Amino acid sequence: MRRKEDLRLLTGRGRYVDDLSFPNQLYASFLRSPHAHARIVDIDIEKAASAPGVCAVYTATDIGRAGLGPLPVSFMPENAPPGYAPTFPLLAGNVTRYVGESIAMVIADSETQALLAQDSIQVTYEPLATSVGLAEAASDGAPELWPGKAPFNVGFLWEGGDMAAVVTAFREAEHLVEIDVINNRVANASIECRGAIGLHDQTSKRSTLYTASQMPHPLRKDLAAIFDEPEKNFQILIGDVGGGFGSKNSMYVEQALVLWAARMLGRPVKWIGNRSDAFITDYHGRDNATHAELALDKSGNFLGLLVDETANLGAYISGRGAMSPVNNQPALAWTYKTPAIHVRVRGMFTNTVPTDVYRGAGRPEAIYLLERLIDKAADQLNIDRVELRRKNIIPPNALPYKTPLGLTYDSGEFEKNLDEGLSQIDWQGFESRRVESATRGRKRGIGLANYVERCGHGVTQDVELKVSSDGRVTVLIGTMSNGQGHETAYAQITSELLGVDFENVEVIQGNTDLIANGKGTGGSWSIPVGGAAMSAAANVIIDKAKTIAGHMLEAASVDIEFSEGSFTVAGTDRTVSWNSLAASAFDPIQLPKGMKPGLDGTGEFVPTNHTFPNGCHLCEVELDPATGTLHILRYLVVHDFGVVLNPLLLEGQIHGGVAQGLGQAAFEDARYDKTGQFNAGSFLDYNIPRASQIPSIEFISNPTPCPANPLGFKGCGEAGAAGAPPALVNAAVDALKDYGINHIDMPLTSEKIWLRIKSATQTKTCV
C-alpha cells in the first residue's frame, strides 16, 4: 500500500510553514552572537530602529519588561543529586555563551529590510575564556560557564545499577576489557529548516502559532509557561513537517518571540530560518565520551559492566537535553546476559549550542558502546566475536527476561536474528572474499551489531474517531508526523479495524484546538501507542454500532457479529453494511430510545511496559589503504518490529535510519575550534552522505508480536540509526586489523583512516 501523503507532497501541494503568509504580515530577523563566550557591554539599536521598513527592535531589556520567562526544561534526571538547569533566556542580556545565541530581534515590513537592519545593530563585546570540548571543560582550572552554580562545569551527575554487585563481579573475573569511545556530535540536517509565524486576536485574546514541530501539545504547554498564562490562550497549528529527528521536539526562542511580537505589534510576524541558522542554532545531537569496562570469566561469560559517560549538554540544558545521556542506561545490557551493571553519567556545560534528543535519543550511543566493547573483548581473549556474542545472548526460553537495570524484555528471538543474518551475508565464506580483496591491494572487513531498543512507555495517547453520516472516518490524534507516513499508517489501521475504505479515512494532527491531548511524536511510540489507542476507540464505535444494528435488525446486540465492515445477526444472512449503519446513526428515528445520534469513539492507551524492537545489522566493507577510502559493499538488517503494518513504510524508516547512522559513523562531524567557532556551518563543510554513498539495504523480517500492545506493534523509527554505527565501525576495524588497529573513533573519514594506517605502518617500521 503506497503512502497516502505522496501525491500531495510530490506535486507541490504540501503545506509547510514557509508556504503560509497572512495579510499585513511582518518579518523577524535575529542578531546572533559571533562569540562563544562574551560579556555584552552595550547594544546600540538606534540605527537599526530607524532603518527603512523597521517596525521594532527588541533586546533582553524588552523581554524582561514584558515579564516573559525562559525556555522551560522538560526533563532532568530524577535519581541524581540536584543538578543545575540554568535559565535559558529568549534573548541573551548580560552574557552570551555560544556562537549563534540570539541577542536581538528585528521586525520589519520585509525579510530583506529586517536582515539589513540587523546588520546595523552595534554590539560591544568583552570576550571571555571558553570551555569548548568535553576534555577541556572537565580539566583543572577550566573556565566555568556558570560560576558558583555549576562547579567544574557539571550540570548533573546520575548513577544507576548496583555498584556492589559490579565490584564483586570484577573481583571474581578472569578477564577485564576496557574501551574508550567518542560518540561524535552531529547536526540535524532535516530538509525543512525551522520556522514560525505568530498571530494574535485582540478580541479573543488568543494567540496562534504556525510552526514546524514534532510536539504541538507540549509546545503549547511551554508557551503557557513562558507567558504565564493558561494553555487555552494558545493554539498550535502544524502542517507538513520536513523532517524532525528529535531536534524539533523541544522549544526554541524564535517560536515564543514571534508570538510575543505579534501581540506587541498587532500584526502577524513570520520568521523562517536558513541553513546557516540551522547549523548554529538547531539543537545538536550525540556528543559524549564514555569509558567502559567488561568483566568476563575464563569461558567468556559476561559477569559485570561498568560504564562512565560524560555528555556534552552545550551552554544550556535544552528542553530534553538531559534525556539522551541517561535514556539509554536502563537497557544497557541489550541482547546480552550481564548479571551486574553500574552506570555513571556526568552532564557537562560547554560553550557550544545545546544538545537535545536525536534519532534514538541515547539508545544508539549505548548500543555502539557495547558492540564495540564486545568486539574488543573477543580480540583480547582470542575468542571468535560471533561465538562470544552467542555465548552471552539471551535465549528465547529466558523470556520474559528482567535485566539488572529493571527492564523486562517480553519478546524477541535474538539468536535467530543473529543466525539468519550470518547465513544471508555468508559470514562463513568471508575469508575467501578477504583474500580476493588483498589480491587487489584492498583491505576487506565484516562487522555486526545486535540491538534491542526500549520504546513506547510512559506515554499515554488519546484518539478520537469521528464517523460521518456517509461512513467516512476522521482520525484526531495528538502525534505529529514529520515524514514517517502517519496519514497512511493511521488510515490503514482505521480501515482494518472498522472495515472502511482506506481512501475514506482522513487523519488530522497538529491542531491543538481540535485535538484535546497529545504527546507528539518521538521515541518510536506513534504507531504502537497511537495505534493501540485507535483500537480502543474503534471498539467503542463497534459496541455502539452493534446496538444500533441490533435495533435495525430486531436482534439483541450480543447476537450481532462485526466483520469487514458489515454487521450480521449470528447464524443468519441478515446484515447491515457500514455505510447504512452510519447513516442510521444520525437519524434519531432509527436509533434505540434514548441513544444520542452519532457514531464517534474516544480511546486511550496506557502502556504497561516498553516495546522492545530488536534485530541484527551486518556490514561488509572494503578500504583502499593508499587513500583511506571506505566502501560499503553489503548491508543487511534482520529486524523484529512485532506485527508489521506496512512493509513499505517500515523499509523507508529503516533506510532513513541506516543512512543517518552511516552518516554519523563515516561522514558527519559537527566540530568546533578551540575558540568555540563552529567549523561545519554549511554543507560544504558538514558532510552528510550522498545517495551514491548509501548501499542497497537488504532486509530479513523475523517478527514476534509485542504482548504489551493489543495490535502487536513495537515501533521502528529509530532502529536503523541504532544498529548502523557499530556495524560499520566493527567492519572497518576488522579491515584494519592487519595494522594492529583495534579501535577508531567516528567519523571514519578517509583522512582519519589514512592517518591511522600511516601511523601504524611507521610504528612497525621503526620497531
Protein language model annotation of sequence segments:
Residues 166-227, 326, 445-469, 477, ...:
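Conserved beta-alpha junction segments in alpha/beta enzyme cores
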Residues 7-8, 121-126, 132, 214-216, ...:
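Extended active-site and interfacial segments that coordinate phosphate-rich ligands
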Residues 93-95, 230-238, 263-274, 278:
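Conserved catalytic cysteine-centered active-site region
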Residues 1-155, 176-179, 254, 264, ...:
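Flexible, low-hydrophobicity surface segments
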Residues 244-266, 270-272, 486-494:
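Thiamine diphosphate
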Residues 68-72, 117-120, 211, 220-222, ...:
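Short acidic, glycine/serine/threonine-rich loops at helix termini
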Residues 51, 61, 73, 81, ...:
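C-terminal catalytic domains of large/alpha subunits in multi-subunit enzymes
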Residues 5-8, 74-86, 152-196, 287-372, ...:
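Glycine-rich loop/linker segments at domain edges
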